[in-house]
Structures are given as C-alpha cells and as structure tokens.
Amino acid sequence: MAETALHTPGKNYTFGTVLTAMVTPFKENGEVDYESAAKLATKLVDDGCDGLVVTGTTGETSTLTDEENLGMFKAVKDAVGDRCKVIAGTGTNDTAHSIQLSKRAAEIGVDGLLIVTPYYNKPSQAGIQAHFEAIASATELPVMLYDIPGRAGIAIAPETIIALSKHPKIVALKDAKADYQSTTTVLANTDLDVYSGDDGLTLPLMAAGAVGVVSVTAHVAAAKYRILVDAMLAGDLATARAAHFELDPIQRAVMSHVQGAVAAKHILNWQGVLPNTVVRLPLVAPSETELETIRTDLREGGWEI
C-alpha cells in the first residue's frame, strides 16, 4: 500500500491544494478577453488559490482555438508568475494534437498539464493508457490525469490509473467520477496527489487521503475552500466540517442549476469581477427562473444578491 500525503507537515504539493478551474472570459463580441482573464487569475490567487487550471472543462476549451488556448495560458501565467501553479488544459481526444498543444504550452512556461480522458472515441483501457503515456512523455512537465466519465463517456479504470502512476511525469489525478471505492483503491495503491473534481466531495475524498480540490465554486469562495482544505490537511475535522456545510448552498448555486461556467460567470459579473456573462455556443444564458434559483442559494449562503 502506498503512503498517502495527507497530514504530511510542510508537504509541497506539485500543483498546490486549492485550485480553481478557471472560466475563460469573453468580450461582448465573443473574442477571448485576456485582460479580464489576467485580472481574474490575480484575484483568485489573492483569495487563496495556489493553483489555477486554465482552459479545462469550465474554461470552455472545446470552443477555443489552439491560439486562444495558448493565449489564455500566457495571460494567466504572466499575471500570476510564481505566486501559484498554472496548469494548462491540453488534453483532447486526439493524441497527436494533445502532444502538439502540450509542447507549445511548455514553451510558454506553464507549470503542468491537465489531460482529460479521450472523449467520444471510447477507446479501450489499453488505448487510454497509451494516450496518457504518450502525452506525458512528450514534455518535461508534470501531468494531472482528469477522470470525468460523465463528460468523457468512459472512466479510467482504477487498474489503469495505478499503471499510469508508474510514469515519472504522471503525478496527480483530478477525480470527478464520484466513485468513492475507485478513489480509495487509487489512494491505497499509488502515490498520486489526488484532487476532488467534485466540489461537494472535497471533505470526504480528503478524509480518504486526497490532497485538495480543483473547484469551480472557488471562483467565488476560494477563501472558504482554503479553510476547509487546510483544516483537513491539519487533521482539524471540526473546522473542515463547518466550512463544508457553509459552502453547501454556494456549491449548489454554482453547480446544480446550470452548467458551472455559466453560473460562475453570472456570479462573478454580479460581484463586479467580470464585465459580462458571455459564453460561447452551445452554452447559453440561464433563464430568469434559473437565475433566481441561483440567487436564492446564494442568499442561503449569506450573500446579499
């Protein structure tokens, strides 16, 4: 059984412990708003994030060109420098394309790569393993696997993750499949830094040995996640539980009613952080009923909206 990193005093995690999966701001004309992205990244670090995932699912990566992806990586890295880790979402369902984008991201100076399960193709586990290993071998950057079967259409089997953990560049897992037994198996048999990819499961996954969270809700509640994660790493369950329950209505507001990027952009706009709420098709704006439900949850969480 591998030793988990939980409660290790002074442990320096490769990607940090409170990471935001950043939205990609757009201008009213639909172009990427790199200036707003830089300002948002700076705010998130000021609020307590020590890692930022750029152009992942929440960053609407499937609607971005390669040049827009690279522009986002550069804008965020230039804004935050060494204050936090910048992880570039360079995974696609085309291995060769993923390698090309990863190499270009490395040239920009990002700190790591987030590689999602190859979606739509539905490869075998052998194909999934070969895909990840090829990308991880293409640069010197550390890699975080991203297991999200609800979007990819296929899960990474625990046995495949265990095999992948032996690759020297594969050091972390963003676990977004809500399969506690699978996560437990991975934690018990690897030295990967595991991150909750489901905001509401941060506490229970950390109780099993995960080291933090890659969160959408942290756009608007990073300081509270910092309290929760630091408390869990310190073994202070009472403080962590209190933060967990305080976060619950905020998590519902961001994640339960409309797509996370859509909700996050509206809340950030209400806060004055983003100048607009523009998303790219096929995402669309919420209905007024959905917006009011989001506001109701935020009020329950103590917000004045």
Cite the ranges covered by each PLM segment:
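Short helix-capping segments at alpha-helix termini
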Residues: 78-84, 107-109, 139-141, 166-169, ...
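C-terminal alpha-helical cap/extension of soluble enzyme domains
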Residues: 3-10, 14-24, 43, 47-49, ...
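A general structural signal for well-ordered alpha-helical segments in protein cores
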Residues: 37, 69, 73, 98, ...
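Gly/Ser/Thr-rich helix-start
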Residues: 31, 57-60, 90-92, 198, ...
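Solvent-exposed, flexible loop/coil residues
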Residues: 27-30, 36, 68, 123-124, ...
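Active-site beta->alpha loop and helix N-cap motifs at the rims of alpha/beta catalytic domains
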Residues: 3-20, 24-153, 161-163
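Catalytic alpha/beta core domains of metabolic enzymes, predominantly
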Residues: 134-138, 149-248, 252-256
